[in-house]
Amino acid sequence: MAQPSTKVYDLIRSRIMSGTYAPGQHLVETEISQELNVSRSPVRMALKRLTQESLVTTESNRGSFVAQWTRSDINEVFDLRQMLESRAASLAAQSATPEEIARLQSLVDEMAELAQRRAEGYRDDLHHNNQAFHLLIVSAARSPRLFQFVRTLTDTSLTLGTYFYYSDADIDRSVHFHQDLANAIASRNPSAAEALMAAHLCLAHTAFETSRFGNDEQSA
């Protein structure tokens, strides 16, 4: 049975990802503990864990707040991901093992099923699937430093919450890109894999930014 702090963590994290808790929102321990009918201890532990994951920020004498991302932050993270992961996809097409290629296809199949069924909590499941897919490609590139750099970027709250801002059309397009990427790597086509990853992350960047900010230029 899951510990109270784990259940509280899962709930707060889900609310942050879905936007129920908005960026910059004050997360008051007493209010959350009363709502969830738990003591303040598991709430405090959950907020500490979320702070370590950069989903929450803690300010002295003020408390905990949902982490905020500016338009500039979004541009920086996606630009770096596009540069690094495009290179990783090219390398993966040259060095991925048959087992890794099979696993990539398995993740694509799972993603397609999740997107089709759209069961409760499917966006969170899509996030985990997506992260596993991208990190597997980077791992298959056989570059430990590249993997560490990308892992740092994909662990940000900005990247973790991407699927909660996607439209159904965005999700369907993402599934198709993942299939095309898996095919390019399986066929040992580095240039195609690199171009597909660049296009995939460029469109993901646009979809996320548009959904997150719309045309509000004041968020930069």
What are these regions (language model features)?
Residues 2, 6, 175, 191:
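Electropositive phosphate-/nucleotide-binding environments in soluble metabolic enzymes
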Residues 1-94, 210-220:
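Short linear motifs at protein or domain termini
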Residues 170-171:
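Active-site loop of classical SDR/Rossmann-like NAD(P)-dependent oxidoreductases
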Residues 77, 87-89, 94, 98-162, ...:
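Conserved amphipathic alpha-helical segments that form helical-bundle/coiled-coil interaction surfaces
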Residues 70-71, 160-164:
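Short alpha-helical transmembrane interface motifs in multi-pass membrane proteins
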